[in-house]
């Protein structure tokens, strides 16, 4: 009775990862997070100076953002070992990224708080996404395929983000549209986190092929 089961499992793991809904959820979690992150890395000083902050403050906040992206590694990695399901954590972190982007727009006097929150949450979502590549796959070959998929889409979105945000700013004359774009990316990232954070694998989710 174990032989047919192993054959079925092999059939599931041999399918292209591009066909799995779960693989796309993980890929877009990483990709949309990179999209948002690179917009902020590129344009944060300009956003801050246009909302009344000095160039010195903008530079300091930009540095704080990049430091904050590294902090989740100290907290999340031990926590991940204790959590079987990371859906709620992924959703909350990505939604906080969306909230922070809107905070920069509508409550710029708290920009330092929003900047730290954005950095921490985007760094955390990145760590979660990378963890899901191994947690949600069934063998090393599948993990390598999913890693390639997520990196190719992720780098594409990361490259598009700053250019699109810059074009929107040039067209509209303000940072409202780019920051709303970041917020929308954060919400979509949160929805992908709900799916990719579930305690399952690609083989177990084979009924959700695209």
Question: Which role does the model predict for each range below?
Answer:
Residues 174, 180-210:
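Multi-pass alpha-helical transporter architecture, strongest
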Residues 61-65, 115, 146-150, 178-181:
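Hydrophobic positions within alpha-helical transmembrane segments
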Residues 2-26, 210:
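Juxtamembrane intracellular "pre-TM" segments in multi-pass secondary transporters
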Residues 47-52, 82-83, 132-140, 171:
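Helix-to-coil boundary motifs at intracellular loop junctions of multi-pass secondary transporters
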Residues 19-73:
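Extracytoplasmic gate region of multi-pass secondary transporters
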Residues 137-175, 182:
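A late C-terminal transmembrane helix in Major Facilitator Superfamily
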Residues 84-132:
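C-terminal transmembrane helical hairpin of 12-TM major facilitator-type secondary transporters
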Residues 72-85:
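Helix-to-loop junctions at the C-terminal end of transmembrane segments
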């Amino acid at each position: 009775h174990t032989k047919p089961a192993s054959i079925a499992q092999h059939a599931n793991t041999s399918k292209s990862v591009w066909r799995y809904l779960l693989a796309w959820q993980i890929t877009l979690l990483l990709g949309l997070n990179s999209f948002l992150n690179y917009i902020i890395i590129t344009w944060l000083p300009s956003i801050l100076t246009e909302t009344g902050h000095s160039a010195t403050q903008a530079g300091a906040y930009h540095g704080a953002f990049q430091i904050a992206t590294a902090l989740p590694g100290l907290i999340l990695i031990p926590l991940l070992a204790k959590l079987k399901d990371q859906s709620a954590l992924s959703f909350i972190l990505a939604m906080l990224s969306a909230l922070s982007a809107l905070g920069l727009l509508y409550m710029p006097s708290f920009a330092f708080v929003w900047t730290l929150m954005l950095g921490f949450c985007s760094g955390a979502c990145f760590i979660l996404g990378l963890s899901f590549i191994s947690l949600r796959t069934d063998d090393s070959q599948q993990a390598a395929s999913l890693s390639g998929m997520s990196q190719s889409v992720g780098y594409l979105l990361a490259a598009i983000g700053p250019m699109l945000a810059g074009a929107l700013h040039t067209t509209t004359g303000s940072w409202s549209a780019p920051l709303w774009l970041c917020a929308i990316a954060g919400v979509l990232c949160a929805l992908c986190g709900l799916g990719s954070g579930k305690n399952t694998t690609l083989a177990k989710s084979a009924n959700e092929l695209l």
